[in-house]
Amino acid sequence: MRGREEVRGRRGRVWSALGLREGDCLSVMGSGGKTTLLRHLAEDTENDVILTTTTHMAPPGHPQDPPFLAFQNLERFRLDWAGMPPPRRLLTGRFQPGGGKLAGLLPEEVDGLADLPGLALLAVEVDGSRALPAKAHASHEPVFFSRSTVGVSVLGMQALGRRVMEGEVHRPALMIQRFGWSSGHRLELEDLERIAGAYLALLPPGRRILVLSQARSVPEDLLRDLARRFRDRVERVLGQSEDGLEVLG
């Protein structure tokens, strides 16, 4: 990638809110808005961007998805990339036979993408949450890659008021074990603080950002209250809605 400097091409509110620099590699983890964030990033710039995953993500076809380029191997991808005119904004991954998800790349393959000429941003989903707003992480995740420069933890605010049970949160049994809650426990703001703190503890070294997604599902005073609790723990706290990102702290 090019040197670590502010991105020079057109960029909008999402890139500015995240404070992105030329050549950043984002590890995006958590629940309730990771793929939405990646789509916002691709829509918000005229720079070259690649979106992918090290685990699984929704297959291409959403109206906000950038063009899809199937990943076969790094050499083939480099050739395809070199033959495309800028701006190159792509979603990549492997189709999983018989599955409804897009299969991810190996961490070393993601690292190889970081060296593509002209690439301004590499944004990578590194875990899954089955479209639920809160989760507990299993021992095999997140699946990070070594070139990551920014760790982004996403927490869905629709988790507020949900119960710790199947269909409400991802891996409720692990959540009960780790936080000492009972089955069916109703999540309050203090519980979301603990969940977000657990997410942040998993991030690799580097700049750290917390995104409170589904921001319009809760009163603004509660959203800002939760954001204030993390101001000394991360570089910035953002609220995410369908319209984009807002800096909360």
Where on the chain are the PLM-derived regions?
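General beta-strand structural signal in soluble alpha/beta enzymes
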Residues: V28, V49-T54, L91-G93, L122-V126, ...
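C-terminal lobe/tail of nucleotide-utilizing enzymes
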Residues: R4, L200-G249
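Inter-motif core of Ras-like GTPase G domains
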Residues: A138-L160
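Phosphate-binding/switch loop-helix module in NTP-utilizing enzymes
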Residues: L91-A136
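N-terminal pre-Walker A segment at the start of P-loop NTPase domains
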Residues: M1-W15
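N-terminal phosphate/diphosphate-binding loop that engages ATP/GTP or pyrophosphate donors
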Residues: A42-F95
